[in-house]
Amino acid sequence: MKLQITQAFQRHFEAEPLVVFAPGRINLIGEHTDYQEGFVFPAAVTQGIWVGIAKNKLTVCRAFSLDFEQEFCFELDSMSPRKGHWATYIMGMCTLLHQAGYPLENFDLVIGGDIPIGGGLSSSAALSVSLGLALSELFAFAIPKKNLALYAQKSEQLFAGVNCGIMDPYASAFGKQGQAMLLDCRNLDHQDVLVDLGDYGLLLI
């Protein structure tokens, strides 16, 4: 998938991108308890969202979705996120970072992934987190992952109209291979837990 993102970026924008990945997630224990300030036990999955990004010298940002095969342009000083459009998540994160004082510049973006949209694996959280990570690295913002997870949650709530909790973006930002995490949603403390199933596996139905 990383190669697909890189090649698509080269075709559309004739430049070399920074490529960043954020995973989707499953939840093993604690469904719907994150927005009740309870405990949850999510784990990252190998599928997720990839973004390719680079600065441009234009007056607009350009975003291309591999899944929808659409390009969308917007200006950083006049963003209008609207429900039901894939670019809402991009403009939502940019709006919140701008409001937090991060000096964004115009950029080109390609997004794609191998996670089913609407499949219950938090593709929207993975998109917001991957974009946040990419912007933070591209512009040397060094935004803490916890803050990125909170921005991703707020973006979905304010701009996509989804009453989501913190679990999805937090698991996407902090998930590690071979581990789940016990997350206390009261204070966002978490503990990584090794998941070694031996000869067994997990089947999601």
Name these PLM-found stretches.
Residues 1-121, 125, 132-145, 150-154, ...:
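ATP-binding N-lobe of GHMP and related small-molecule kinases
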Residues 164-167, 171, 175-205:
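Mobile "lid/hinge" segments at catalytic clefts and subdomain interfaces of large enzymes
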